[in-house]
Amino acid sequence: MRFVVPPHLVSTALVSALALIGVEAASAQEFAGRDKLFAHSNEFLRDVIQVTDGVYVAVGFALANVILVEGDDGLLIIDTTEGMGAAREVRAEFDRISTKPVRAIIYTHSHPDHVRGSRAFVGDVEPEVYAHEKQLRENLPTAVGRAGRDGGNQFGLALPAESRPNAGIGPGLGLGGGDGYMRPTRTFSGESYSFEVAGVKVVLGYAPGETDDQLFVWLPEKRTLLPGDNFYRAFPNLYAIRGVPLRRVDHWLESLSDMIALEPEYLVPSHTRPIMGRTAVDAALTGYHAGVSSVLQQTLAG
């Protein structure tokens, strides 16, 4: 005897099967994204990495990296983390490399995770602190009110640790130990500013992008570029969901072009791990430029 299935039951079964397939596909996609996020934590394994002769970067101690450049009779520090607790830990690691006095500190920009640990690196010698002059107008070393609340939401600070493997650009935001911010003592207002500290030649280039006060640090004798937050191994933060002043993406592209033109051999961002080798650095910067450009062009095209 042949059993005939009513058409409406066939339709119901088909819809249910397709729905189940859709759920399974969505779940697979969800898990793939989760797995990528957990794997991204490898970017923030705590380490002090020697990039090239006299250049080191401390990764994974705080949301932002700290970069050390050793000179003849002193040290240069670039960016100082978001709090004195993490900065002291970095200082202890750097002391294993050199106990020369810190002669200068450079802020790549005004975000709190780059400026609040400065006092941890000061010894008997009071260092000069370099920044672009716009930082004096824009710097907010502590986040308050809505900015602080929404910033916490952006980084998932209220989530349990198992649901927050990293903050995307660092292991997490660590504000412990207090605020050690130091006001810049030397600023520049043009496109570039060159100086020498402890025998190391330094060029600061004005590079608006993630912030309007952003600069990059170029060490010409070492062919080493420190791009600040205009490059890291994550999609560029063209507009932060916490709410921030407008970020001029066209200016960001110009800044990336300026950095590419330097033809650096070493790239040491203030978030995520460094990139070594001329070919790898060029591929990273040009790929970043292409991605940002694509977003801009497609947005303008509607």
Q: Where are the model-predicted features located?
A:
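N-terminal secretory signal peptides that target proteins for export/translocation
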Residues: 1-7
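Bacterial N-terminal signal peptides
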Residues: 8-22
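Boundary at the C-terminal end of the N-terminal hydrophobic targeting segment
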Residues: 25-28
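Metallo-beta-lactamase
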Residues: 32, 50, 74-75, 82-84, 101, 137-206, ...
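Active-site metal-binding motif and surrounding structural segment of the metallo-beta-lactamase
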Residues: 43-44, 51, 72-74, 84-128, ...
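Conserved beta-strand hairpin/beta-sheet module of binuclear metal-dependent hydrolase folds
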Residues: 45-96, 216-219, 223-228
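Short, solvent-exposed loop/turn and secondary-structure capping segments
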Residues: 61, 69-70, 88, 117-118, ...
